[in-house]
């Protein structure tokens, strides 16, 4: 018997799901980069991570996820929407992008909003990860902020790229 379902959107690696799967949860990582025929990693604790290809920039697919999981035991959600058009590290390119599409940042911020709407409709706690960005202005301020080094660990030379 599963402890519940954990959803992760815009998630290619599934790394954030690993502790959940190891603890016996059924986890789903959705990302457009996954192969059409997904794969499943299983863990000793009875959990798994299933990798599913999905274009999350298509609102119809967000609605599809809501329909798939609305009657399931979803216990947590996480999302890592693309930050390319929002992160302040790319501010030097904002003017050029706005010239091509004045709505480019509104469109980009919608992806985070859609994730929040999905998790809200499913009634589950969640987080949406994004670096320092225009999201704070276009949508809402974060409830929590952190630096990646706070959650990382030392990488031995043999494992470094």
Language-model features: locations:
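Conserved active-site and SAM-binding loop architecture
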Residues: 1-161
């Amino acid at each position: 018997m599963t402890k519940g379902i954990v959803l992760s959107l815009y998630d290619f690696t599934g790394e954030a799901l690993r502790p959940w799967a190891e603890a016996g949860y059924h986890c789903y990582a959705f990302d457009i980069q996954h192969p059409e025929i997904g794969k499943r990693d299983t863990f000793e604790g009875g959990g798994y991570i299933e990798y599913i290809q999905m274009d999350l920039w298509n609102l119809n697919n967000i609605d599809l996820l809501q329909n798939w999981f609305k009657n399931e035991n979803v216990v947590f959600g996480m999302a890592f929407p693309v930050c390319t058009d929002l992160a302040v590290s790319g501010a030097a390119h904002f003017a050029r992008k706005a010239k091509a599409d004045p709505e480019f940042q509104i469109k980009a911020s919608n992806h985070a909003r859609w994730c929040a709407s999905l998790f809200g409709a499913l009634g589950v706690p969640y987080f949406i990860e994004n670096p320092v960005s225009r999201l704070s202005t276009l949508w809402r301020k974060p409830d929590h902020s952190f630096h990646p080094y706070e959650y990382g660990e030392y990488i031995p030379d043999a494992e470094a790229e």
